[in-house]
Amino acid sequence: MNNNIINLIAAIILSLSIIFGWQYFVVKPEQKKQQQQIAVQKAENLKKQQLKALVEPATGIVVQEESQVQRIKIESESLTGSISLKGLRFDDLILKKYKQDLSKNSPEVRLFSPANTENAYFAEVGLVSNLSSVKLPNNDTIWNSDSEILSPEKPVHLFWVNEDGVKFLVTITVDENYLFTIEQTIVNNSDKELPVQSYGLINRKYIAVEKAVNILHQGPIGCIDENLKEYSYDDIKDKKSEKFAASKVDWIGITDKYWLSSLIPDKSSNYSSNFNYALKQGIERYQVDFISPVQIIKPGKNFSIKSRIFAGAKKVDLLDKYEKQYDIKLFDRAIDFGWFYIITKPVFYAMNFFYGYVGNFGVSILIVTVIIKLLMFTLANKSYRSMKKMKNLQPEIDRIKNLYSDDKARLNQEIMALYKKEKVNPVAGCLPILVQIPVFFSIYKVLYVTIEMRQAPFYGWIKDLSAPDPTTIFNLFGLLPFAPPSFLMIGAWPILMAITMFLQQKMSPEPADPMQAQVMKFMPLIFLFMFSSFPVGLLIYWSWNNILSIIQQYYINKFN
């Protein structure tokens, strides 16, 4: 086989291996600070006890008791649910715009659930103190509210007064999307100084996540000291805890493929933050939390602090908006755009732009593919000419190989001299393929991780561009009443991709090496089985790209 082709195939395989394996096998070095503020250090042990008490419901509590607690109803265009007035916990949240699946009666996606339910998942913000004598609101406190409904048009005002006359006020607002703003105010009407710390936490009962493809992060995540921190559930389980002392915390949270819950603390100070794992009574729990330095509130003085909770769908434009509006560093990285971020995000923007005009992401993929093809036309033309020259030079190359078969150095020297004389670049034919690799993976990432592509239909039987083609040739595309095993789910679009790939090969210059020609003949069949389980949107892109390549090849053949 021609050495250049062998090297090309090896390079492509190596590239695929690196791209898929990088995020799974490479552990990013995490730098830890060694110093911590003295006030925070003194409060650390008590803080642990208080936060622990907050996240562990007492044994014996049942769901019926939880339902008896008064709640504030959440009602907006994007959300429905409620906030518990006991402990001021965000533990009941449903995303109104998203269904769990494509079935007719599918329920809406539930994000938060109370602590004593099967899929416990909730968020809190509050106050703790390094003095046990200070009476602060805790997880048993029943707050008073001026309203029963929280909506974008109507904030909710809460209050509670301790036995010393210290007043605690909380104002909660929600926007039309997924962002809650919580402002806590302490009015110290006592004759004592009050040392307090603000905290926030997100606690979740572990649910097994999708592990079919190791190019997607799910689990604890955050931006600390302007660096993205990502830990898988297994990472935190092994370490039990990952701590960051006195750091700039832009946001921390827990991310799924499409959903995010995140704490966004006030920017007025640094915070200690933790990613934790605990196993209690056979239940695995994960928690992310932050706590501020000690703030001393003098008698007769007030203190206010504002924090935010994001809980909802990871829409690209929405995260971009919040990142800019509230200066939340790297908030868009909650969407795992991956290694080719600088390409993947522009590809998404292009698709989303055309979607605004055509109203179908499948059609948008077709348009973006045409644009990419036009941008690469000159490169493809040069590549084709180089391949033709290489084929014409093959007899001369074979003659040189026979002549200098015992002298490798002279052989390479003579071949390079021939290339120079004929003005041929031996790798020029590889460039279009190599350039398309990042484009291919960028489109794959867009289809796989963006909420905009979730359950986005095309035409005909394609109801979800982010899922594999649901048909298979082995039951005649649904005409026969049985479901083949998953490895035989080879649908119409994978078959179309393989056919167009075969036709494209027929249009291209035939390899001079017989062995190489045989290998290339089997490539469509190999790719048919390899990519049948990939998102159908990717196969639409590839099939359309092949069709455009055939048209392009016809044009080049005719006019060159």
UniProtKB/Swiss-Prot annotation:
It is a multi-pass membrane protein. Gene3D superfamilies: 2.70.98.90. It is found in: Cell inner membrane. Keywords: Cell inner membrane, Cell membrane, Chaperone, Membrane, Protein transport, Transmembrane, Transmembrane helix, Transport. CDD domains: 5TM_YidC_Alb3, EcYidC-like_peri. The chain crosses the membrane at residues 5-25, 334-354, 357-377, 431-451, 476-496, 522-542. It holds the Pfam family YidC_periplas. One of its GO terms (cellular component) is plasma membrane. It comes from the Bacteria. GO terms for molecular function: membrane insertase activity. GO terms for biological process: protein insertion into membrane; protein transport. Belongs to the OXA1/ALB3/YidC family. Type 1 subfamily. Interacts with the Sec translocase complex via SecD. Specifically interacts with transmembrane segments of nascent integral membrane proteins during membrane integration. Required for the insertion and/or proper folding and/or complex formation of integral membrane proteins into the membrane. Involved in integration of membrane proteins that insert both dependently and independently of the Sec translocase complex, as well as at least some lipoproteins. Aids folding of multispanning membrane proteins. This is Membrane protein insertase YidC. It comes from Rickettsia rickettsii (strain Sheila Smith). The gene is yidC.
